Amino acid sequence: MKKMMTFLKKAKVKAFTLVEMLVVLLIISVLFLLFVPNLTKQKEAVNDKGKAAVVKVVESQAELYSLEKNEDASLRKLQADGRITEEQAKAYKEYHDKNGGANRKVND
């Protein structure tokens, strides 16, 4: 019996308790909840800036088209002429739909 007690004392292993593990998981989950919404906001901001850049490209291509052809440019004409892609036209429409289209210079 004495040998068994000494063996158990020697075999005692240091480890984390369940409460400590739960506290760590709680802290990690709180940090996760704080950072994820910020990441989605940043992604939206980057997408908006990218679409704003596309708007400038489309408008400059429309101006060049108008100068060369002496007629008003439209998104369809610019696409048919190969000056912009379908994705650029879509981004142009989405940008103006989201921001109220008051300053829209190129029609469909």
Swiss-Prot record:
Keywords: Cell membrane, Competence, Fimbrium, Membrane, Methylation, Secreted, Signal, Transmembrane, Transmembrane helix
UniProt-reported outcome of changing residue 74 to C: Normal rate of transformation
Post-translational changes noted in the entry: Undergoes proteolytic cleavage.
Membrane topology category: Single-pass membrane protein
Effect in UniProt of substituting residue 40 to C: Detectable but reduced rate of transformation
Signal peptide interval: 1-13
Induction and repression of expression: Up-regulated by competence-stimulating peptide (CSP). Part of the putative comGA-comGB-comGC-comGD-comGE-comGF-comGG operon.
Spans through the membrane: 16-36
Keyword Transmembrane: yes
UniProt name for this protein: Competence protein ComGC
